[in-house]
Amino acid sequence: MRIIMVEPERRPYETELEDSLGAMQRCVGGTIEVVYEPGGRGAALICNDEGKLLNLPLNRALRDEKGEIYDVIAGPFFICGAPPDSENFTSLTDEQVDYWLRRFAKPEFFVRVNDKVICVPVEEPGQ
């Protein structure tokens, strides 16, 4: 299955993943949770459902249609296809790969200020 892997403090990358529950759990380091972003473009974000409880490193912010942060994913996650008319995950299309590589292109750093989470994109040297 063609996926986009997103790890804390790293740029996302395209890779292949066996289409099995065990492979998905190994990929995120535990039991999985499926998250659908607003306007998710027929894709699902698969993360460790205990990432925050296990104090895994914060990874990327999820935003609503207005660009406001509504959640932060802790630990590694991947994006795969999730057709609305199917219960199975699928490979991403070329268009989905391009979109999700851009969507999560920059690693993010998080700071809590006055009960609000501030997200700072991390620029690579020379950018």
PLM region spans:
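Domain-length accessory/inserted modules outside core catalytic folds
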Residues: 1-127
